Amino acid sequence: MTTNNSNFKYPKDFLWGLATSAGQVEGAAAEDGRTPSIWDVFATKPGKIFNGETPAVACDSYHRFDRDVEMLKYIGVNSYRMSISWSRVLPQGTGKLNPLGVDYYKRCFEKLLKAGILPNITLYHWDLPQALEERGGWVNRDSIEWFGEYAYKMFREFGNIVPMWT
């Protein structure tokens, strides 16, 4: 079967992008106030992750985000879906925000926008703060309040610069 796509055009508002998650690319797992997530703890269990890899360094996007944005721009994407590490912005899962974590994400979102790339933010990608897991995790009825507080704080901090949320 032959398909001729020479006349095909994407719609003007089509979003062409890539996606990552904080735990898979950020690294810096114990820097600037970030506390462990359930994924960090799981990854330290022998035999659970190939070659014993952990999210501690990952792709080191935390330290290389400028270069990452340059590569995204070079590829030609106009959208980038990434997640916020809940334990980077709220080290205890609830309560006081970590200003270093908030500042990191604010800089990321601003760099993406300056490069013409729309940030599309995922609030949760399998990385519940370990502090909340120790309080019962998702099966604790309070988890509804925990997530609501987290979501509210993220929208309050970034809602004016982040156009898309998942």
Regions found by a protein language model. Name each.
Residues 1-2, 121:
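Intrinsically disordered/low-complexity terminal segments and short unstructured peptides
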Residues 69-166:
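Substrate-binding cleft and catalytic face of glycoside hydrolase catalytic domains
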Residues 2-98, 102, 108-111:
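N-terminal structural segment of carbohydrate-active enzymes
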